[in-house]
């Protein structure tokens, strides 16, 4: 089941407005989110126990969708360059840039949602595809889904990928069993 375990209201729009990505670092016990609509260089931390807003981290590169890879201890950001190209930025746990890789998402729209990373692999969504990038920064898989569904973010549990999907202002949780 999908139960609400707490409701938190944040009023600082400059920090948390339009936060469409959320990732967790178990080593710091912090959630990390971005607000690219206001400042595309800003990352905000939230304490996972208290849900209090923490520090704001500003980095030189734009950051849109963000994932933490607990196996490599790296943050990964997926940033649209143009309608088809995305820049994958790899950061250490202190948000120092390690590597950037430009990839062709084979999609004709800037929209870029969701991010998941594990053991060097990165998964993100465009408006109608899910894209997998391997450890070397090469696209290894692109899977289509209906255009009327918009994946907002994703995570994995017991080797099943779950996605939060926006459809006509309603949110649905989908599982992708064969991903």
Predicted regions span which residues?
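Hydrophobic, aromatic-enriched interface-forming segments
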Residues: 62-108
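Loop/turn-rich, solvent-exposed surfaces of beta-rich toroidal or solenoidal domains
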Residues: 105-133
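Blade-loop segments of beta-propeller domains
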Residues: 3-35
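Structural motif
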Residues: 1, 39-45, 83-90, 128-134, ...
């Amino acid at each position: 089941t999908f139960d609400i375990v707490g409701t938190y209201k944040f009023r600082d729009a400059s920090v948390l407005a339009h936060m469409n990505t959320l990732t967790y670092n178990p080593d710091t016990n912090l959630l990390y989110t971005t607000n690219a609509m206001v400042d595309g260089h800003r990352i905000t931390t939230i304490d996972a126990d208290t849900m209090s807003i923490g520090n704001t981290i500003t980095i030189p590169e734009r950051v849109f969708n963000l994932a933490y890879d607990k196996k490599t201890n790296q943050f990964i950001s997926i940033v649209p360059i143009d309608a088809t190209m995305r820049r994958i930025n790899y950061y250490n746990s202190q948000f120092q840039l390690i590597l950037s890789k430009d990839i062709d998402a084979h999609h004709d729209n800037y929209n870029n949602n969701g991010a998941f990373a594990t053991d060097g692999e990165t998964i993100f969504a465009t408006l109608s595809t899910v894209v997998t990038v391997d450890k070397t920064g090469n696209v290894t898989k692109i899977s289509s889904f209906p255009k009327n569904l918009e994946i907002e973010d994703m995570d994995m549990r017991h080797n099943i990928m779950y996605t939060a999907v926006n459809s006509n202002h309603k949110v649905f949780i989908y599982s992708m069993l064969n991903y």
